[in-house]
A protein has these predicted regions:
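Active-site rim helix/loop that mediates acceptor-substrate recognition in acyltransferases
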Residues: 38-57
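Acyl-donor (CoA/ACP) binding surface of acyl/acetyltransferases
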Residues: 1-34, 59-150
């Protein structure tokens, strides 16, 4: 069953035409908070920011048919490193789908040096990172993981 569900999810870079789907997904405050994503409270400012992210190719979408059910985001950091974040709608969580989606993303983008910060209480997200070769750098209330750079 899990492999069938993974096969139903398709990943690709999101483009400006995907803006309505991305905005609908990010409108779920509980989902964005659980992912540690802080968005502007002003809807116009939020839409402007997401439009810029789409134009810069920072968002990779996870699609179940025509429905956007998740996002993997990368944002440039200092010293040629990228911050990684991801979120998946609750209906699709708990089945290893994000682990598989991150693996697919990494295969499609093998040269990215990535760092991810995860709440210590978010064990599922930590498993996603560990299963995809991320190494724990710092542990506390927020755990920091890195992949692809010594």
């Amino acid at each position: 069953m899990q492999n069938q569900q993974q096969a139903k999810l398709k990943g690709r870079w999101l483009v400006l035409a995907d803006l309505p789907a991305v905005m609908a997904l990010l409108a779920d405050e509980a989902l964005t908070q659980a992912a540690g994503l802080t968005l502007a409270p002003d809807p116009a400012l939020r839409q402007w920011a997401v439009s810029n992210w789409l134009q810069e190719r920072y968002l990779w979408g996870l699609w179940a048919g025509a429905q956007l059910v998740g996002v993997i985001a990368t944002f440039p950091q200092a010293e040629a490193e990228w911050a990684l974040g991801y979120l998946l709608t609750p209906a699709w969580q708990g089945r290893g789908l994000m682990t598989a989606a991150v693996a697919t993303f990494l295969r499609a983008n093998p040269t990215l040096a990535l760092v991810a910060e995860v709440a210590a209480t978010n064990r599922a997200s930590q498993r996603v990172l560990k299963h995809n070769g991320f190494q724990l750098l710092n542990q506390g209330a927020v755990c920091t993981y890195r992949r692809g750079r010594d």
